[in-house]
Amino acid sequence: MRRRNARGGISRTVSVYLDEDTNNRLIRAKDRSGRSKTIEVQIRLRDHLKRFPDFYNEEIFREVIEENESTFKEL
């Protein structure tokens, strides 16, 4: 579903399943910040992706592929 967001662009909707501990941490964080749960998730996800843009490092990924003798030669 496409919606306009506060930044003026088109946003996308994502659904996730959270374990109880993660959900409780998220609720406590949103209560402390005064934001909605949705906005808290959006801010935290954006921050994580900025700080860890290459979370699955290509070099490590290649090592795993070679170790498992995968048919994939390149990413």
Curated annotation (Swiss-Prot):
Lineage top rank: taxon: Bacteria
Keywords, ordered alphabetically: Activator, Conjugation, Cytoplasm, DNA-binding, Plasmid, Transcription, Transcription regulation
Keyword DNA-binding: yes
Subcellular location: Cytoplasm
Keyword Chloroplast part of the UniProt annotation: no
One GO CC term on file: cytoplasm
GO terms for MF: DNA binding
Matching InterPro entries: TraY
Described purpose of this protein according to its UniProt entry: Conjugative DNA transfer (CDT) is the unidirectional transfer of ssDNA plasmid from a donor to a recipient cell. It is the central mechanism by which antibiotic resistance and virulence factors are propagated in bacterial populations. Part of the relaxosome, which facilitates a site- and strand-specific cut in the origin of transfer by TraI, at the nic site. Relaxosome formation requires binding of IHF and TraY to the oriT region, which then facilitates binding of TraI. Also positively regulates tra gene expression.
Subunit structure: Part of the relaxosome, a complex composed of plasmid encoded TraI, TraM, TraY and host-encoded IHF bound to the F plasmid origin of transfer (oriT). Interacts with TraM, probably through its C-terminus.
NCBIfam families (UniProt xref): PRK13740.1-3 (NF010302)
Entry similarity comment: Belongs to the TraY family.
Protein name: Relaxosome protein TraY
